[in-house]
Amino acid sequence: WIVMRDRHGVAHFTINDHQRVHQCGKFGLCGICGKPLGKHVKGNSNKGAFFVGGPASFYHDRGAFLDPPLHRECAEYAIRVCPYIANPSYGKRIDDATLKPEHMPAGMAVMQTGGNPPNLDTRPNVFILGLARRWEMFEPRPGVILFKVPNHRRDWVHLSAWRHGVELDVESREVKDEIFRRLMAAATGGV
């Protein structure tokens, strides 16, 4: 639902529609289907909402997500079919290279969120699907909307690791914790 569409209606899956991302955060809508997540997803509820991202988004003190919260079914769909996440041989640039300036919708501009666009060199080797009790939307600078979980040590209810669109078979909580500790160390350079 947040995928940017050009003047001809062509979807550009590597570009988010800023207005829709904002609507998701403000009104509690799923970033994939655009339907309400339900009143239980904000605040201190135990129900929560799902996020997909690399280990640093989940475990780093400043970790955040570009994509808004999702329904469980929508999150699992995304983690299974998104080429950047699920396809190990995906080799395209992950930025605005697919959008011709003359096809941009009226009144819309494409801006990078900072640094180089994600590419195969920066793609995590494992992605995480997480259920958060609470989440917040914030705008660190005009035009950039991010989502974060207030207390990443306490607010994650469930986490699962995925590689190439398949959930990793990890049985015990102790093994999961060790895997996530190692993933976080790798994602932050051992910090």
Describe the residue ranges of each PLM region.
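Short, non-ligating residues that shape and space the ligands of small metal-coordination modules
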Residues: 37-43, 47, 80-81
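Short, flexible, mixed-charge glycine/proline-rich loop motifs
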Residues: 13-27, 61-65
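Short cysteine-rich clusters marking metal-coordination/redox-active sites
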Residues: 30-34, 71-74
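Domain-exit/linker segments immediately C-terminal to small folded modules
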Residues: 64-191
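Short linker/helix segments within small regulatory modules
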Residues: 54-68
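Short Cys/His-rich Zn2+-coordinating modules
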Residues: 4-19, 51-57
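A structural/positional concept
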Residues: 2-8, 27, 33
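Short, flexible beta-strand-to-coil junctions
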Residues: 34-35, 45, 54-56, 132
